[in-house]
């Protein structure tokens, strides 16, 4: 009820794993694509109530990624690709700010969309 009253915004998170077909990530990619599908349907169903729903697919440096790098440096080097921009995104600055923008009234007409914030990673072969 509050979402209808507030004409709010919903921002869900998915992953490039589903968009780009990352090797060895079948279950993870399927789950994240489910989020994208759910979000598109919600955007259609909730649009008449002036609720917009979008998805962000981030690639950010996280504590878990850092733990993996420290625990398994060779596996990290072999398996974790660096985006073309040469660094992973900063969760607060490069991911968080786009989420704030998506929740602003200026972006109200944007709904059912997927935004990637992955430093060009999707351009890699």
Per-segment meaning from a language model:
Residues 47, 52, 110-112:
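Short, small/polar-rich loop/turn modules that mediate ligand/substrate recognition or access, typified
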Residues 7, 20-26, 48, 86, ...:
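Active-site loop immediately N-terminal to the catalytic Tyr-X3-Lys motif
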Residues 74-93:
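Catalytic Tyr-x(3-8)-Lys segment
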Residues 1-9:
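A short helix-coil junction within the Rossmann-fold of NAD(P)-dependent oxidoreductases
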């Amino acid at each position: 009820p509050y979402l209808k009253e507030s004409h709010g915004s919903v921002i869900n998170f998915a992953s490039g794993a589903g968009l780009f077909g990352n090797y060895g990530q079948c279950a993870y990619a399927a789950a994240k694509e489910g989020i994208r599908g759910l979000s598109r349907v919600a955007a259609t169903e909730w649009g008449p109530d002036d609720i917009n729903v979008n998805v962000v697919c981030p690639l950010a440096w996280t504590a878990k990624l850092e733990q993996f790098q420290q625990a398994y440096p060779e596996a990290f080097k072999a398996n974790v690709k660096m985006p073309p921009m040469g660094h992973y995104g900063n969760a607060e600055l490069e991911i968080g700010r786009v989420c704030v923008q998506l929740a602003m009234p200026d972006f109200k007409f944007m709904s059912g969309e997927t935004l990637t914030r992955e430093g060009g990673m999707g351009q890699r072969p």
